[in-house]
Design a protein with these regions (language model features):
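Bacterial Sec-dependent N-terminal signal peptides
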Residues: 2-6, 15-40
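Compositionally biased regions
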Residues: 5, 21-25, 41, 78-80, ...
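A short, compositionally biased domain-edge/stem linker segment
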Residues: 18-19, 56-63, 124-135
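Short small/polar-residue motifs
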Residues: 50, 55-62, 92-98, 163-169
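Short amphipathic alpha-helix segments
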Residues: 81-91, 150-165
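Autoinhibitory propeptides
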Residues: 94-144, 149-151, 160-162, 168-223
């Protein structure tokens, strides 16, 4: 009887240890917010060495993302998950984010960061320089694309073809006769690539990303 009792006690202790281990793993996983929000950190913009920019008539305006930290990243969110992910990233204790500055609009911030950040719940724009921008200034890419359709052409085919990347609502500006699309994308690189692709269409006069540009820069833009 005593031997049987010892065996059962051993089994019970093993089961308890297993449950404790599972509980510990679950708790660790539950608090791993990098995993929960799929946050990735990079020493440089992953698209640093790829061509980035936009077309102005027949001229390609090349944009170069920052190569060294601190990085000035614009983060935009449109969901509760995005806001939670942002607050987690900002609150990390290992000094990834040096400063946070709220921007006009209520759902966008400027992050001064030691790392380039990627998160599917956030739109992240790098800060870019170009040949004709004043030193120390940066261009940031908004998650919107402005399109000027050719006379008599509709923007609906664009909305249909790129439904996975553009929001269904189309905002038409009467004054300039342009169409503004909101993007369902995560990086400024993706917005630039899509704007360039749309710009090549036969029914489009021109297409550009919406940009935040310092008022005294020499960068050419139509808006």
């Amino acid at each position: 009887m005593k031997k049987s009792f010892i065996v059962w006690m051993g089994i019970a202790l093993m089961m308890a240890a297993g449950m404790s281990s599972c509980s510990s793993d679950d708790e660790e996983k539950a608090t791993d917010y990098d995993y929960l929000y799929h946050v990735s950190y990079f020493d440089q913009d992953p698209n640093l060495n790829k061509q980035q920019g936009y077309w102005y008539d027949e001229t390609f305006i090349g944009l170069t993302p920052q190569k060294e930290p601190p990085y000035y990243l614009v983060a935009i969110w449109d969901s509760e998950e995005g806001e939670k992910a942002l607050n987690y990233i900002v609150g990390k204790k290992d000094g990834v984010i040096l400063n946070r500055y709220d921007l006009e609009g209520g759902n966008r911030v400027l992050l001064v960061s030691n790392k380039y950040i990627s998160c599917p719940y956030l739109y992240i724009s790098s800060s870019y320089t170009t040949n004709n921008i004043i030193e120390g200034d940066y261009i940031r890419i908004c998650n919107m694309i402005i399109v000027k359709m050719k006379e008599g052409k509709s923007a609906e085919p664009i909305a249909t073809k790129y439904a996975h990347s553009l929001k269904p609502n189309i905002e038409e500006t009467k004054l300039s006769k342009t169409v503004v699309f909101d993007c369902i994308l995560n990086t400024s690189y993706e917005v630039l690539q899509l704007a360039e692709e749309i710009n090549q269409r036969d029914d489009v006069e021109w297409a550009e990303p919406n940009m935040w540009i310092p008022f005294h820069t020499y960068s050419r833009t139509r808006h």
